[in-house]
């Protein structure tokens, strides 16, 4: 449904499934990301009224909070939370507080799984500066194949991360 841009139908299916299986990590991460994505792209997707009518702006932080509680030691959850929260901290609360939380989630994901190139890429990107530029550029190159492999599946989460984390062009410039 996501692939066919049937977002309202996808929302209804996610909502029903999450009500039945709120402990399912794969369901949580896809539902959470779906909610974040439609909030981030509401104007482009022409979903502004739908988001307001269904209180997505309060549902998203609630589902995020579920994930933070249940998966606080899961590097994949921390990566997804960190990346999304860092981009739009105001979706979750006070901007500076949540911006720092986003960076902290990315750092925790990397610390829990320091050999994971994608988590390292996201973490270094969150603290990017001239001092870590070379290391960041190098991890962009090293992570490229893993990005394409890990995010090769269906759904918004996979297509989004496959596109935004494949940074080989940026690193080679």
Show the residue positions of the predicted features.
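N-terminal alpha-helical scaffold/docking segments in eukaryotic complex subunits
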Residues: 1-20, 27
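Alpha-helical repeat scaffolds
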Residues: 9-16, 45-70, 95-109, 133-150
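Amphipathic alpha-helical repeat scaffolds of TPR domains
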Residues: 21-46, 72-91, 115-131, 154-170
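Intrinsically disordered, low-complexity, charge-biased linker/tail regions
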Residues: 50, 138-173
